Amino acid sequence: MVSPSLRVPFAVALGAIGGSLSRYYLSLWFAERFGPSFPYGTLIINLSGCVVMGWFMTVAMERPEISPEIRLLFGVGFLGSYTTFSTYELDTFSLWQQHRFATGLVYWLGSCLFGALAMELGILLARLWR
């Protein structure tokens, strides 16, 4: 039996293994099937992760018999490593459910904009350190 203090990190880590392997092999499959000219795998993975995250979190919150460890294993571990996009959309939707529409919109657009800028910064830093 796992120590109570290790249950949370164990659940997240165990779920992450399956999520990351699923993402990896599905990405390969889509690239082999449709070619590398468009990131179909990433698109399908991100969208399917959002559907599954929405379904799972709705069901998990309505059913107390689903333990916190199972929520963490699947919601944070599996889906978090399958796609972080689903978590991003869940956070946005949560803000909107709280009627914090402006905050949700700023978060949603800001994540896209600042994510692109952060990517550009990372590229710039990598080029500077060559």
UniProtKB/Swiss-Prot annotation:
Keywords: Cell inner membrane, Cell membrane, Ion channel, Ion transport, Membrane, Metal-binding, Sodium, Transmembrane, Transmembrane helix, Transport. Its main location: membrane. The chain crosses the membrane at residues 10-30, 41-61, 72-89, 105-125. It catalyses: fluoride(in) = fluoride(out). It is found in: Cell inner membrane. The keyword Cell division does not apply. Pfam families: CRCB. GO terms for biological process: cellular detoxification of fluoride. Na(+) binds at G80, T83. Na(+) is not transported, but it plays an essential structural role and its presence is essential for fluoride channel function. InterPro entries: FluC (IPR003691). GO terms for cellular component: plasma membrane. The keyword Transmembrane helix applies. One of its GO terms (molecular function) is fluoride channel activity. It is a multi-pass membrane protein. Fluoride-specific ion channel. Important for reducing fluoride concentration in the cell, thus reducing its toxicity. Belongs to the fluoride channel Fluc/FEX (TC 1.A.43) family. PANTHER family: FLUORIDE EXPORT PROTEIN 1-RELATED. This is Fluoride-specific ion channel FluC. It comes from Synechococcus sp. (strain JA-2-3B'a(2-13)). The lineage of its organism: Bacteria, Bacillati, Cyanobacteriota, Cyanophyceae, Synechococcales.
